Amino acid sequence: MDVPGPVSRRAAAAAATVLLRTARVRRECWFLPTALLCAYGFFASLRPSEPFLTPYLLGPDKNLTEREVFNEIYPVWTYSYLVLLFPVFLATDYLRYKPVVLLQGLSLIVTWFMLLYAQGLLAIQFLEFFYGIATATEIAYYSYIYSVVDLGMYQKVTSYCRSATLVGFTVGSVLGQILVSVAGWSLFSLNVISLTCVSVAFAVAWFLPMPQKSLFFHHIPSTCQRVNGIKVQNGGIVTDTPASNHLPGWEDIESKIPLNMEEPPVEEPEPKPDRLLVLKVLWNDFLMCYSSRPLLCWSVWWALSTCGYFQVVNYTQGLWEKVMPSRYAAIYNGGVEAVSTLLGAVAVFAVGYIKISWSTWGEMTLSLFSLLIAAAVYIMDTVGNIWVCYASYVVFRIIYMLLITIATFQIAANLSMERYALVFGVNTFIALALQTLLTLIVVDASGLGLEITTQFLIYASYFALIAVVFLASGAVSVMKKCRKLEDPQSSSQVTTS
């Protein structure tokens, strides 16, 4: 029964005050989990030995041959990553993130412990399998934070968490280069530092708060309460007028509710997640998302280019070792990785200031820059100068980081967080499937088992093919746009006459 008059207004005001205080408290609670997750990401990425992995495996510590490293060991990471990605994607959501973050930390510890003490081909292959687990579980790191902060904080906490890993990787690369070139430390010592850092990350992960919600399996529908004419929605107060229901973004807010939303005053036991229903919803969302041509276009480029990017990054140390063997000269792998990461970060920052009609020129832009990537990989492969190789690699990484950021923005622009996670997972899975096929044919000893220089020639041709495909698709799109612009003009002229 409604309470009339001033009492009703006082009750509404009191309810509004309580809700605003609750929202303020929730906003303040974002700092601790974000700080802990950033600390975890920083230490997990602080691995000074990583840019020197290939010289370490080929050196006296492991004494492996080039064929064993490139054709029998490195492919194991690709295969394990592919096999684990989809189960980990579902398990991450079902287990509510934190257990999978802990699994990643534990996998990194096992990886670097084995890198220090394991010997022989089979042992190093097992090491690559554990590194595949660590890579596949990385999705938990990037999605955990969305379950413990409000929707309005998503952009800020995303930038913090990604910056933490970026800074960690850069600091690790610079530290490794300084210790090798200036202090004369051994590569074994760098791996000891890496093991220490990932152990610290694992310890930090235990202090992360356990999320109560997740995107799919533990998702709560939108909560809506009314207090005498005031509509309380997702921790905010909205006037119940026709105009407010048609404000820009109203539907978007309804579909993108925060995951850590407060429970209603009357607590009810959370229903057990219907796994089959979740999978059915995922399938319907998949069909709906990829029926959009712009999203399909950007997703195709994402999958194709990420496949090539993984191959180049995974085997570029082998190419450098071929051009300039580390046992005969000083190497600067760590410095190159640090420079390419920093310049890539600058390029990513500049994306926000690029003004272009991506719906018209997006495919042509992808074609042009894919051609530049192909040229960089080709120069890296054919010019037998280590400094040219380093410079080409820096250009390659800058262009890829620039384009993948644009692709991410274009895909995420009109998707809810749930659908963005789905599209990200599907695109990554397709990229890994393509990479597995490419690895099996080109790299694996059971396939062609080609030399590293021949492999990079194929990778350059691969990116050139991507450029041709998007050039043709972009030309068709531009012509269609021009025809649409001409048709209204011609029809208006006919009407005038």
From Swiss-Prot:
<feature type="modified residue" description="Phosphoserine">
    <location>
        <position position="222"/>
    </location>
</feature>
<feature type="transmembrane region" description="Helical">
    <location>
        <begin position="129"/>
        <end position="149"/>
    </location>
</feature>
<feature type="transmembrane region" description="Helical">
    <location>
        <begin position="73"/>
        <end position="91"/>
    </location>
</feature>
<feature type="topological domain" description="Extracellular">
    <location>
        <begin position="119"/>
        <end position="128"/>
    </location>
</feature>
<keyword id="KW-1133">Transmembrane helix</keyword>
<dbReference type="Pfam" id="PF01770">
    <property type="entry name" value="Folate_carrier"/>
</dbReference>
<dbReference type="GO" id="GO:0008517">
    <property type="term" value="F:folic acid transmembrane transporter activity"/>
</dbReference>
<feature type="topological domain" description="Extracellular">
    <location>
        <begin position="47"/>
        <end position="72"/>
    </location>
</feature>
<dbReference type="GO" id="GO:0015234">
    <property type="term" value="F:thiamine transmembrane transporter activity"/>
</dbReference>
<feature type="transmembrane region" description="Helical">
    <location>
        <begin position="29"/>
        <end position="46"/>
    </location>
</feature>
<feature type="topological domain" description="Cytoplasmic">
    <location>
        <begin position="355"/>
        <end position="363"/>
    </location>
</feature>
<feature type="transmembrane region" description="Helical">
    <location>
        <begin position="338"/>
        <end position="354"/>
    </location>
</feature>
<feature type="transmembrane region" description="Helical">
    <location>
        <begin position="286"/>
        <end position="310"/>
    </location>
</feature>
<feature type="modified residue" description="N-acetylmethionine">
    <location>
        <position position="1"/>
    </location>
</feature>
<feature type="site" description="Essential for pyridoxine transport">
    <location>
        <position position="111"/>
    </location>
</feature>
<dbReference type="GO" id="GO:0031923">
    <property type="term" value="P:pyridoxine transport"/>
</dbReference>
<feature type="transmembrane region" description="Helical">
    <location>
        <begin position="456"/>
        <end position="479"/>
    </location>
</feature>
<keyword id="KW-0219">Diabetes mellitus</keyword>
<feature type="topological domain" description="Extracellular">
    <location>
        <begin position="311"/>
        <end position="337"/>
    </location>
</feature>
<keyword id="KW-0007">Acetylation</keyword>
<dbReference type="GO" id="GO:0015888">
    <property type="term" value="P:thiamine transport"/>
</dbReference>
<feature type="transmembrane region" description="Helical">
    <location>
        <begin position="420"/>
        <end position="443"/>
    </location>
</feature>
<keyword id="KW-0225">Disease variant</keyword>
<dbReference type="GO" id="GO:0055085">
    <property type="term" value="P:transmembrane transport"/>
</dbReference>
<feature type="transmembrane region" description="Helical">
    <location>
        <begin position="100"/>
        <end position="118"/>
    </location>
</feature>
<feature type="site" description="Essential for pyridoxine transport">
    <location>
        <position position="112"/>
    </location>
</feature>
<dbReference type="InterPro" id="IPR028338">
    <property type="entry name" value="ThTr-1"/>
</dbReference>
<feature type="site" description="Essential for pyridoxine transport">
    <location>
        <position position="105"/>
    </location>
</feature>
<feature type="site" description="Essential for pyridoxine transport">
    <location>
        <position position="191"/>
    </location>
</feature>
<protein>
    <recommendedName>
        <fullName>Thiamine transporter 1</fullName>
    </recommendedName>
</protein>
<dbReference type="GO" id="GO:0009229">
    <property type="term" value="P:thiamine diphosphate biosynthetic process"/>
</dbReference>
<keyword id="KW-0812">Transmembrane</keyword>
<dbReference type="GO" id="GO:0007283">
    <property type="term" value="P:spermatogenesis"/>
</dbReference>
<keyword id="KW-1003">Cell membrane</keyword>
<feature type="site" description="Essential for pyridoxine transport">
    <location>
        <position position="109"/>
    </location>
</feature>
<dbReference type="InterPro" id="IPR002666">
    <property type="entry name" value="Folate_carrier"/>
</dbReference>
<feature type="topological domain" description="Cytoplasmic">
    <location>
        <begin position="209"/>
        <end position="285"/>
    </location>
</feature>
<feature type="topological domain" description="Cytoplasmic">
    <location>
        <begin position="1"/>
        <end position="28"/>
    </location>
</feature>
<dbReference type="GO" id="GO:0042723">
    <property type="term" value="P:thiamine-containing compound metabolic process"/>
</dbReference>
<comment type="similarity">
    <text>Belongs to the reduced folate carrier (RFC) transporter (TC 2.A.48) family.</text>
</comment>
<feature type="topological domain" description="Extracellular">
    <location>
        <begin position="186"/>
        <end position="191"/>
    </location>
</feature>
<feature type="transmembrane region" description="Helical">
    <location>
        <begin position="364"/>
        <end position="380"/>
    </location>
</feature>
